[in-house]
Amino acid sequence: DAQGYIDLSELDLTSCHFKGDVISKVSFISSNLQHVTFECKEIGDCNFTTAIVDNVIFKCRRLHNVIFIKASGDYVDFSKNILDTVDFSQSQLTHSNFCECQIRNSNFDHCYLYASHFTRAEFLTDKEISFIKSNLTAVMFDHVRISTGNFKDSVTQLMVLSIDYSDIF
């Protein structure tokens, strides 16, 4: 397109395997990405707005400047990735895995994250991590490192939050 993006919008990409060093400037807007695997060092400047991401696996080192606004998916695996400036606002990512992620300057406002796991995740941000008006029912924030977070007007039923203070002592 005019901005230099590869346009893979509104496509059925079920069970595709994207492999390479860097995946950059790709638009997956409104695409069906069920059972897709991304295997690369970095995904940058990509747009997954309103995409269906059921059972997607991100085997990457880093996602940078990536948009997931209004994306929906069950069992999305982001584990062990650096999520740097990722916008998850208004997304529905249930039963998803954010375990051992380093999450920097990312937005989770208005998200539905039912039963997702952030075990041993680190929230490294210049400002507070934001989960404003999110549904965090049964979400596990277990042994996380977080300096400050905004959970204003969020549903937190059955949410578990335990903070790892080990580097303080």
Identify the residue ranges that each predicted region occupies:
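Tandem repeat scaffolds
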Residues: D1-F169
